[in-house]
Amino acid sequence: SVWSVYPGSVLLYPNAASGNNNITWNFQGSGYLWLPPLMEDPLDSEVVYIAGGGINGGNHLIKLTKVGNSIVPQELSYPFNNTVTSMAYSPIDPSHWYVMTYNGTFYHSTDYGESWTMTSGFSGPESHYFYGSTIHPSNQDLGKVVIGGSGYSNDPVFISYNHGQSFQSFSDGLPNTMVFEIDGTLTDQVLFAATQLGPYAYVEGEDEWINIMGFSAPDQTYWSLEYVPEIHTARFGTYGRGIWDFIVDENIDVSYGDVNNDNTINIQDIILLVNIILYDLEYTISGDINNDNSINVIDIVMLSDIILERFSK
């Protein structure tokens, strides 16, 4: 199924692959953005959340549930201080939810949105007046969150390493511009940003954003962005010039050291490396820690160092 938002309504296509029949829910109440963001429920495929506004006034998250051939709304109780402009949850631990409001206020929840804590002493980038702002929780480090929005009189991007308790600027290399969306590779090695002035990328270790438009991509507003890991591609949506793909290295999402692909690097991965060497098993790129196209005792030593370093933090 596919959920989508349109000015004034939310549409659900229950069988998008086989037809265009849809179910519609018209906005109730007031205070919504022109194109308010949607967020899927991390546990229930029949549920999404829309940013309010509110059905009964105020500014809330509104839960939308598919029930038969209709969409049933439920206004969640927490009152945010302004129109909600961005929502996200951690892909590592989906009980951690994040919200930004129109004036740049940031909120964090540890219980799937039941209760919220507002970041004090911080005013983040404000929202676009009808499209919203952006939150990108890390795919690798719980608590690491990158946010973006209006950057004409302040920095457009900030980063937190503690679920938003504190933020620091993360805008080196970016011009004064509006950042509409941020997404990144599964390993966090590269972040991408869709902005008013074009597409940008931040490579881990380079410590600045770079313009990746090149000579062929359109000089236009880049409204939307999604990183598609299956094809190692950052997919940008532009204003009037269609969809443009930025293809990265096919090994960009390899988590070196995670030999058994369980998203955790530990002693089990060392055991697998030993077995690969002893029994001449098939080469796996995630076990080739030093990228010399072979797996040997050096990779075991390097993997041991990685594990010891993580335990020492």
List each model region and its residues:
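Beta-propeller blade termini and top-face loops
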Residues: S1-E250
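Cellulosome-associated attachment modules in secreted, modular CAZymes
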Residues: E250-K313
